[in-house]
Amino acid sequence: ELRSPVNPHVAQAAEIYRGQIAPQAVKTAQPLGELLARIAQAKDFDSACGLLGYRAQPEFPCYFNVKVSGEVVAVNTRSRSGKLTLKLTDAPLSSVEVQIGPVYRGTALRDSYRGLSYGDFNDQALFGDFARAINQASIDELAGSPPKVGDHITVYGVFSSWQAPAEPLLITPVRIQP
C-alpha cells in the first residue's frame, strides 16, 4: 500500500511563519508610496516585479512586501474573512484593506516566501494545507487586541498583483503595531 509521508513543512508551519516568513516580510517591506513610485518608473511591470517583488513562476502574480501606516476607518468582522480599512497617510492610494480573519483569503503569505516552493511538497493538497497553516499562524499571532476604528497603526504585510497596483489593495498582514 502506498502512503504519502507526512510533510515536515506542514507540521512546522507555525514555526516557519514565526521564524522565517514574518521576519522576511518585515525586513524587506517597502513603504507603499515608495514602492508604487518605483513600480511606475520601471520599464514594465515584469521588470518591477523582478526588482521589487517576488514571483516563483511566470504564471503567478507578483508578491510585494509592504509597510503602510494610517488610521483605521472601518472594521468588518461580520464576514469570516474579516478586514479593516486603513486610510493612508503616506501613499498615493487613499486606503487599503487589511485582512484580520478569522480566515484569510488567498495564499499570499505562502507564495511570497522564498524559502519553500511547490516542489518541496508531496502534492497539491499538502501545499494547500501548508498555506492554510501559515495563514492560521498569522491570524493566531495577531489575535491579541484587534485594531478599532480611530486607531493609528502601521501594518507590515504582503499583497499580490498582476499589474501596477491600484485600489482596492488587499494586504495580508504579518505585523500590526500602534
Regions flagged by a language model, labelled:
Residues 1-178:
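OB-fold and OB-like single-stranded nucleic-acid-recognition modules
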